[in-house]
From Swiss-Prot:
A Pfam cross-reference name: Chloroa_b-bind
PTM: Photoregulated by reversible phosphorylation of its threonine residues.
Binding site for chlorophyll a 6: 257
Sequence positions that bind chlorophyll a 2: 117
Topology relative to the membrane: Multi-pass membrane protein
Residues noted as binding chlorophyll b 3 in the record, renumbered to the chain: 186
Cofactor note as given: Binds at least 14 chlorophylls (8 Chl-a and 6 Chl-b) and carotenoids such as lutein and neoxanthin.
Protein name: Chlorophyll a-b binding protein CP26, chloroplastic
SUPFAM superfamilies attached to this UniProt entry: Chlorophyll a-b binding protein
Lineage: Eukaryota, Viridiplantae, Streptophyta, Embryophyta, Tracheophyta
Any one GO biological process: nonphotochemical quenching
């Protein structure tokens, strides 16, 4: 019988096959060692276990008792984190100052609220930026394609204009379409029309690229989704405040700031020394 030994030299796995005395060794040696695939192009077997280990290490950063929390360990003792925040849910940093998630039913409810708002915020942030950027740099997306001014066109009895094409949608049709399409989809989700085990992360037809087929990768994607969603919610709040204060969209605000960082920033707007004085 042959036994297999593994060694490493300069980071390259080396496989040696030891031949026992009963397998007719050479006369010059009682046993023979044969180097197998020293310079083989085939990936070594431990590579898969290494990838699994890296994924497990990454999961440990975001789930479980040793996950990252909202303050460093030196500033927050983990014993101060509420027991119901045990790291089983994506995005759990141990932060619930108002105790909103003490009751399990409330925890599930607020988790759903946050995730749905996060998804809408990510779509909304893209919808605020992309049309205005396209319009500013060459495309014809309407008179200004600024998010709050586009909606005002419908209030004035106008129709929408995208890439130079008029879309015959007035205010009534826009409201009806929103209520029917969005409200219908939300009702279908609440009543579990497709009978999914996880209403918040259904997968299946809602994951056409199969990004979350691997459970561990799916868990990491949940973390990325909620982190980006929270950032998008703050971005939307910033867009609202910018529009109220400056009367401009986020792309125009950014362009003016980049063209003159010291003349167009938060301090100059508050002080009223910028060209666009605040309307507060």
């Amino acid at each position: 019988m042959a036994s297999l030994g593994v060694s490493e030299m300069l980071g390259t796995p080396l496989n040696f096959r030891a031949v026992s005395r009963s397998s007719a060794p050479l006369a010059s040696s009682p046993s023979t060692f044969k180097t197998v695939a020293l310079f083989s192009k085939k990936k070594p077997a431990p590579a898969k276990s290494k990838a699994v280990s890296e994924t497990s290490d990454e999961l440990a950063k975001w789930y479980g008792p040793d996950r990252r929390i909202f303050l460093p360990d030196g500033l927050l003792d983990r014993s101060e984190i509420p027991e119901y925040l045990n790291g089983e849910v994506a995005g759990d940093y141990g932060y619930d100052p108002f105790g909103l998630g003490k009751k399990p039913e409330n925890f599930a409810k607020y988790q759903a609220f946050e995730l749905i708002h996060a998804r809408w915020a990510m779509l909304g942030a893209a919808g605020f930026i992309i049309p205005e950027a396209l319009n500013k740099y060459g495309a014809n997306c309407g008179p200004e394609a600024v998010w709050f001014k586009t909606g005002a066109l419908l209030l004035d009895g106008n129709t929408l204009n995208y890439f130079g094409k008029n879309i015959p949608i007035n205010l009534v049709l826009a409201v009806v379409a929103e209520v029917v399409l969005l409200g219908g989809a939300e009702y279908y989700r609440i009543t579990n029309g497709l009978d999914f085990e996880d209403k918040l992360h259904p997968g299946g037809p809602f994951d056409p690229l199969g990004l979350a087929k691997d459970p561990e990768q799916g868990a990491l994607l949940k973390v990325k989704e909620i982190k980006n969603g929270r950032l998008a919610m703050f971005a939307m709040l910033g867009f609202f405040i910018q529009a109220y204060v400056t009367g401009e969209g986020p792309v125009e605000n950014l362009a003016k700031h980049l063209s003159d960082p010291f003349g167009n920033n938060l301090l100059t707007v508050i002080a009223g020394t910028a060209e666009r004085a605040p309307t507060l």
